[in-house]
Amino acid sequence: MKQILIISGKGGTGKTVLTSSLAALAKAAVLADCDVDAADLHLLLHPVVKGTQEFWSGQKAVIDDGQCINCGRCLSLCRFEAIKALKNQDGSLKKIEIDPIACEGCRVCYYTCPVGAIQMEDRLSGLLFISETKYGPMVHAKLGIAEENSGKLVALVKQKAQEIAQAEGKRWLIIDGPPGIGCPVIASLSGVDLVLVVTEPTLSGIYDMERVIDLAAHFGVLTKVFINKCDINWDNTRTIEEICQKRGIEVIGYL
């Protein structure tokens, strides 16, 4: 089994469209959408969900109103403004509450509460889906609102896709990666055989292409480039070709 990762240094270059096109052309392939923060491969491939798995990651603080003495210590220590003081009409303190979206799970309030009224609870951060498309099995996921640890969810998506590919004897694992060069992209890069960078002939497209090429080179992954929307600026297209030539990277296609 060979793993091909399609990524771009920025969003909107057309990597998901290219991924879906490769899926239509490939035979004996498993598909994985690792852009878990904003997954959209399903919009093109219309998968039928066969199984769902919860993704639990990290913890968030929860206040036990029965134990809380409203001392306000946690309120003054929270650097993320996740703890709020609710007041009565006369201005007196009614209760302390924690905004679950703003909470970063840093545990400062948990460790400093004088009466132990704050507990850390595991949080459901997202969902993983195992689906079937007319082009083959597909693994994709959805991260919850304001949730983090998308790198861990990316790793889980890849793991499930690899298991399916090995169990069914598939030849290819085609991965639609996230944009940028952050943790989710690094998680996507792990163990792949080829990185296909989709870029566009714009100044931001060129700059971000170079950043993601540098990232792939750091991990020693073979890299190719595909230029999408190549005719919107031929001067920039030639600039991309020159950059790739200097780096010894093949431009394998234009659209």
Each model region followed by its residue ranges:
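Extreme N-terminal, non-catalytic leader segments
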Residues: 1-10, 28, 32, 43-50
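Iron-sulfur cluster-binding cysteine motifs and their immediate structural context
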Residues: 73-98, 108-124
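Short beta-strand-centered segment that lines the nucleotide-binding/catalytic pocket of NTP-utilizing
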Residues: 28-42, 121-127
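Walker A (P-loop) phosphate-binding motif
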Residues: 1-26, 66
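Flexible beta-alpha connector loops of hexameric P-loop NTPases
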Residues: 142-151, 203
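P-loop NTPase switch/communication element
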Residues: 39-58, 130-131
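Conserved catalytic-core segment of NTP-binding enzymes
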Residues: 90, 115, 120-130, 152-254
